């Protein structure tokens, strides 16, 4: 019965015990109601007392045998003795009083059953000193409840005998009244008692024998000690006294207790925060401190929700009091920038000012699209740069060069100022810079390192249209601070700077306001210097060497003089411009533009040195004889015949650099300002060439730009 808790309810299991209880209680009740009153008057009043005591004793033992734990062994846990479960032998042998007794492995309970223990197939439990499973009490009979079962049998047998005997006595005393109700009920109770007396008396006698011999029903039925010696017997009297008078065996199963429900918070859940003092430890850039702040639960939740959507805070400012070297460096850099920036010059943004720059060397060819490919030029070999000169010619490049000293040219250090006006062709128009001691060989050396001053607006147009040719890969001048050269020590601030955070239109409008203040200057003569082929590809170096051989073999062509109009052609001396003369659009754009389709001719390579008598126009300044106002987008997208002032030997020397991988047929480039050729009077197109641009209507010229854009330029 106690083992049935927690299992499925089976009504059939309670039929025998219910029937036994009904017959026992019902028959005894009838006996006390109809027979005992007459017997108490006729025989003795002790008869009902005796029967009542016996009946209570029967009920007590019946209840104890039914509801008491028979001595169930608890089962092993699932993770206990797994090795024994798989590897254990079927039996183990122990010696009791010199006799070998086997202990069998129980696969259900997962342990070796002790001696005299057996597994009940009905209760599905291993019971200590298992006797049998009695259906009349609906429980196993084991060591702990065998006493009560045995006493139940004895008391029940005695009670049945008493009921039957006292009933027979009542009938004999009232034989004249056999037809009476009392006599009839007494006779019916005697029949029931007589029917139960035979099996109960037989079972009681059987167990008396077993107790006297010290055996169990299971041992007797299975014949374990048949023909042998029982090691568990202690003699008849000892066996009886052990069953009836010994102390009860301990209980192996704990008493069933109600399970308590405990709510356990997982470790990742934050405990509830009550209103109170919260110690907050702050760590800010190495500065530690403890603040005691009063925060409520609501304020913390609001802060959490805000911090989840907010941007991460900016890095803290450095503590200048702790780092004296950094403070000195920042103060010197601030003073230098304040002295370099003129009154009319735009301020350099802070993040741009201290951004590290990388000089273009071998990495320029490897990464032509890198925005860190910058070109810087050193001071002149002939004219030293002073603070006053640098204040008049600021470079707007404050970042240091990270290139090793072995790869630096002694002329590096000053950046080229960018002027979108003079960058009309595919490669930037070459213009000689006054006041800088560059020679032709030095420019070729810079050019051999793969650097060029391609127009920022031109490259922006290429990038916007998504067409980059092989030439643009060799000329990676895509950084915003790739500036053009400011010529000569002029009092006015230079105009080549374009802020990287401004659009091209705003930058051109700002330059248009400063444009008329530039004065024309003339460049000095330069001497050639040897050429470096360090970072060029193998086929370009081979073709360049072949061209130099041809240059040494063929004499320079005579009769080519610079025409006066060439002085204002807007030529700008930029290193690496001989790589590929290119229009401001890509090769695909030049093929699409109807204004740039001319027969293949030799590219116009301007001379780097000009006579001192010829004065070049100031950077981006208008023509000396023109009064047309400056237009923001005055870039030339057409090509023209090369000027006659350019020597053929220089063209031959620069031809190896004009071989793109995408097989773009390079057109002859002619620099133009405001859509008009600079030396249009001296250079006329060939007989088979189409017009340079669309016809001028009423002083307005239409020029096709990138992506099919048409620009109207007043002449």
UniProtKB/Swiss-Prot annotation:
GO annotations of cellular component type: dendrite; GABA-ergic synapse; glutamatergic synapse; nucleoplasm; phagocytic vesicle; plasma membrane; postsynapse; postsynaptic specialization, intracellular component
GO BP annotations, alphabetical order: innate immune response; lipid transport; positive regulation of NLRP3 inflammasome complex assembly; positive regulation of pattern recognition receptor signaling pathway; positive regulation of protein localization to phagocytic vesicle; positive regulation of protein localization to plasma membrane; positive regulation of pyroptotic inflammatory response; protein localization to plasma membrane
Biased segments, Low complexity type: 359-373, 422-432, 581-597
Membrane topology: Multi-pass membrane protein
Record PTM Phosphothreonine, positions in chain: 294, 303, 348, 350, 411, 436, 659
Residues where Omega-N-methylarginine is found: 617, 697
InterPro entries: Palmitoyltrfase_DHHC (IPR001594)
Region (Disordered): 289-715
Residue ranges of domain DHHC in the record: 104-154
Polar residues composition-biased segments: 442-478, 666-677
Extracellular side: 35-52, 170-191
Family: Belongs to the DHHC palmitoyltransferase family. ERF2/ZDHHC9 subfamily.
Record text about domains: The DHHC domain is required for palmitoyltransferase activity.
Name of this chain's protein: Palmitoyltransferase ZDHHC5
């Amino acid at each position: 019965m106690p083992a049935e808790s927690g299992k499925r309810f089976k009504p059939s299991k309670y039929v025998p015990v219910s029937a036994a209880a009904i017959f026992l209680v019902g028959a005894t009740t009838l006996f006390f109601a109809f027979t005992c009153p007459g017997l108490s008057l006729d025989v003795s009043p002790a008869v009902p007392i005796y029967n009542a005591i016996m009946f209570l004793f029967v009920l007590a033992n019946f209840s104890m045998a039914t509801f008491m734990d028979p001595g169930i062994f608890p089962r092993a846990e699932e993770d206990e003795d797994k090795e024994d479960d798989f590897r254990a032998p079927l039996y183990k042998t122990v010696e009791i009083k010199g006799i070998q007794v086997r202990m069998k492995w129980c696969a259900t309970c997962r342990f070796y059953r002790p001696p005299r223990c057996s597994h009940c197939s009905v209760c599905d439990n291993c019971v200590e000193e298992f006797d049998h499973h009695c259906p009349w009490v609906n429980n196993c009979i084991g060591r702990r409840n065998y006493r009560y079962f045995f006493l139940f049998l004895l008391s029940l047998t005695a009670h049945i005998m008493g009921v039957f005997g006292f009933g027979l006595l009542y009938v004999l005393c009232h034989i004249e009244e056999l037809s009476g109700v009392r006599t009839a009920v007494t006779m019916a109770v005697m029949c029931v008692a007589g029917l139960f007396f035979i099996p109960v008396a037989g079972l009681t006698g059987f167990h008396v024998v077993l107790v006297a011999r010290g055996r169990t029903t299971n041992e007797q039925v299975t014949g374990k000690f048949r023909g042998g010696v029982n090691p568990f017997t202690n003699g008849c009297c000892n066996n009886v006294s052990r069953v009836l008078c010994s102390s009860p065996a301990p209980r192996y199963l704990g008493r069933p207790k109600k399970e308590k429900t405990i709510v356990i918070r997982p470790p990742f859940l934050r405990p509830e925060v009550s209103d109170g003092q919260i110690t907050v430890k702050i760590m800010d850039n190495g500065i530690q401190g403890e603040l005691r702040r009063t925060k409520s639960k609501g304020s913390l939740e609001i802060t959490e929700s805000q911090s989840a959507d907010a941007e991460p805070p900016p890095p803290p400012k450095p503590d200048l009091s702790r780092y004296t070297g950094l403070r000195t460096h920042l103060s010197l850099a601030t003073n230098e920038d304040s002295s370099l920036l003129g009154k009319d010059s735009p301020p350099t943004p802070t993040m741009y000012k201290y951004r590290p720059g990388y000089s273009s060397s071998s990495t320029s060819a490897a990464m032509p699209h890198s925005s860190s490919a910058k070109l810087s030029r050193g001071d002149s070999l002939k004219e030293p740069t002073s603070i006053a000169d640098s204040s008049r010619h600021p470079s707007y490049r404050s970042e240091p060069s990270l290139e090793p000293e072995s790869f630096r040219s002694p002329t590096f250090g000053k950046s080229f100022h960018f002027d979108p006006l003079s960058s009309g062709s595919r490669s930037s128009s070459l213009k000689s810079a006054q006041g800088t001691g560059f020679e032709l060989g030095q420019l070729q050396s810079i050019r051999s390192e793969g650097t060029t001053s391609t127009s920022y607006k031109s490259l922006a147009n290429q990038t916007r249209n998504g067409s980059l040719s092989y030439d643009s890969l060799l000329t990676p001048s895509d950084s915003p601070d790739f500036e053009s050269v400011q010529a000569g020590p002029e009092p006015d601030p230079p105009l080549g700077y374009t802020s990287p955070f401004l659009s091209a239109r705003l930058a051109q409008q700002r330059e248009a306001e400063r444009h008329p203040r530039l004065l024309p200057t003339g460049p000095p003569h330069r001497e050639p210097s040897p050429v470096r082929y360090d970072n060029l590809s193998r086929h370009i170096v081979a073709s360049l060497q072949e061209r130099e051989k041809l240059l040494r073999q063929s004499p320079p062509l005579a009769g080519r003089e610079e025409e006066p109009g060439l002085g204002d052609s807007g030529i700008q001396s930029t290193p690496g411009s001989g790589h590929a003369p290119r229009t401001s659009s890509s090769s695909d754009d030049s093929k699409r533009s109807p204004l740039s389709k001319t027969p293949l001719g030799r590219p116009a390579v301007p001379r780097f040195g000009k006579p001192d008598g010829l004065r070049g126009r100031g950077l981006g300044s208008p023509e000396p004889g023109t009064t047309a106002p400056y237009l923001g987008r005055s870039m030339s997208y057409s090509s023209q015949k090369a000027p006659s002032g350019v020597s053929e030997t220089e063209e031959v020397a620069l031809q190896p650099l004009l071989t793109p991988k995408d097989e773009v047929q390079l057109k002859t480039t002619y620099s133009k300002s405001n859509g008009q050729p600079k030396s249009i009077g001296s250079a006329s197109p060939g007989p088979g060439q189409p017009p340079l641009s669309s016809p001028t209507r009423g002083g307005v010229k239409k020029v096709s730009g990138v992506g099919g854009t048409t620009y109207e330029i007043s002449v």
